[in-house]
Each structure stands twice: as structure tokens, then as C-alpha cells.
């Protein structure tokens, strides 16, 4: 039951402590973000003796210069698969945030033998053959496509400030997040997720709802998961969408607990 790289940052700790069960965490960021956004949680988990890798996917963050028409969901899935294989990781706790949930789904389909459990953190999820725009509300899709047209370029969805992150403008890390956001590759939202196995590929899966405030854009996803995947674990966390920024210690506690239970 389921209860950043290239300057892509690879964070690890070799001085592991005491009785703590040392876990391998791979943290996959969401749209407009990069591996950098996990820094507060990376620091928490490394401080507790775990190994943590938070890659930045192609076309985003410090890899935004690699944005191209071919920067698709499949490319981002390959980014994470290649990190796990290059680091020769096994027994991985794979965490996908927001758009990163689509990526984590593809990774689990391709290399399940390297994974212990999947954690979908306020994730965007679809069924095989669907793309991200297929499950989002039509008003959201229209708004995002209008922003692409207004930007005068066709490869990426422009940054829209902190909208959707749940981060208040007066939060101590608001400026840090805002200045590091980068346009998000449009093709990642129009590329269908093609799976050879059922979503989750038989691995223990947990969906974590960031409930305060709840990100209404993902309401259709949450409804689908609760109705179609009753065997998955379900957790709520008392913070907003960018939980790794808003409540890193609380999120680290939850990830440790889910890792220990799997």
C-alpha cells in the first residue's frame, strides 16, 4: 500500500550517523523551478544522515540555456533515470513535486528495480497516453497558452511570479524563489506520458496533499487519485504547494516517516 546536475546539484553525506536508517532520496522539482528549490529540505535530510540528490532537469534552472523544441517530458524523464543510473543508486525514495510527479511516474515505469517507494508531493499526474494539459482545468490551459502567445516565443510558458506556489510575498524566501524561477518548456505539458505498466508500476505510492492553502488547479488530480488508486497512501501536510520552501522540517519529517514505512 502506498499510506541540482550539470551544475546539477548532487548532495550527499558520507558521515552517516547512529541508529538513523540512512535513505537514498531523489527529489524531482516542479515546473518553473530547479533542483535549487529543494535546498532547505536537502539540508534537513543530509543533517539527519541521509543521501540526497536534487537534479535540475533540462531546460530549467541553471540548465535553462538548454531549452529547445525537443525539451519534452521524455527528456526530463531521461534526466532523472540517467542520474539514478549514473550514481548507481538503489532502494531510492523518489519524490516528485507538482510537474515532477509526471517525471517520477515515467521513471518508475522504466527503472522500478532501483526504487523503494514513490512520493507524489502535490503532484500533477495523468494516465498513460495523456499529457498534462489533458487533466488541468480548461481555464488554466487557456491562461497558460495565452501567456505563451503574449511572450512572443513558442518554446516555454513564462514565469508568472509566485502564483500557485503558496508562498506569500512577505515570506523570507519569497525573493529567493522569485528570482530563480525560469520559463518552463511547453513541450513537457503537451507530450503524452507513455507507460508500459500501470501508474506506479506496483511500487508503494503515497500522494501528499499540501492543504494550507490547497492548490485548486490540482483538484481534478486529487479526485482522480482518491477514486482510482485506493491502494495508495494519502497524506495531508499543513502548508502550501511549495512545501519544501514553506515547511522544510515538516516535509523532511514526513519523508523520513514514509521512507521508514516502505
Give the residues covered by each predicted segment:
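Conserved HGGG/HGGXW glycine-rich cap/lid loop of the alpha/beta-hydrolase fold
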Residues: 23-64
Amino acid at each position: 500500500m502506498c499510506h541540482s546536475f550539470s551544475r546539477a546539484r548532487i548532495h550527499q553525506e558520507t558521515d552517516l550517523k547512529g541508529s538513523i536508517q540512512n535513505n537514498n532520496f531523489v527529489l524531482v522539482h516542479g515546473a518553473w523551478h530547479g533542483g535549487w528549490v529543494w535546498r532547505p529540505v536537502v539540508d534537513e535530510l543530509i543533517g539527519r544522515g541521509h543521501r540526497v540528490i536534487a537534479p535540475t532537469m533540462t531546460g530549467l534552472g541553471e540548465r535553462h540555456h538548454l531549452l529547445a523544441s525537443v525539451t519534452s517530458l521524455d527528456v526530463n524523464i531521461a534526466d532523472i533515470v540517467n542520474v539514478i543510473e549514473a550514481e548507481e543508486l538503489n532502494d531510492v525514495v523518489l519524490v516528485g513535486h507538482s510537474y515532477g510527479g509526471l517525471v517520477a511516474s515515467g521513471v518508475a515505469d522504466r527503472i522500478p528495480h532501483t526504487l523503494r517507494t514513490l512520493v507524489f508531493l502535490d503532484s500533477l499526474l495523468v494516465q498513460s497516453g495523456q499529457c498534462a494539459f489533458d487533466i488541468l482545468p480548461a481555464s488554466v490551459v487557456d491562461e497558460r497558452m495565452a501567456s505563451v502567445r503574449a511572450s512572443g516565443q513558442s518554446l516555454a510558458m513564462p514565469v508568472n511570479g509566485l502564483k500557485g506556489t503558496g508562498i506569500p510575498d512577505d515570506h523570507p524566501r519569497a525573493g529567493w524563489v522569485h528570482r530563480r524561477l525560469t520559463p518552463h518548456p511547453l513541450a513537457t505539458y503537451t507530450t503524452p506520458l507513455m507507460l508500459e505498466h500501470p501508474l506506479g508500476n506496483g511500487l508503494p505510492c503515497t500522494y501528499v496533499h499540501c492543504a494550507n492553502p490547497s492548490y485548486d488547479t490540482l483538484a481534478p488530480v486529487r479526485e482522480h487519485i482518491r477514486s482510482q488508486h485506493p491502494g495508495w497512501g494519502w497524506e495531508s501536510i499543513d502548508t502550501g504547494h511549495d512545501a519544501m520552501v514553506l515547511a522544510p522540517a515538516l516535509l523532511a519529517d514526513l519523508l523520513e516517516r514514509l521512507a521508514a514505512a516502505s
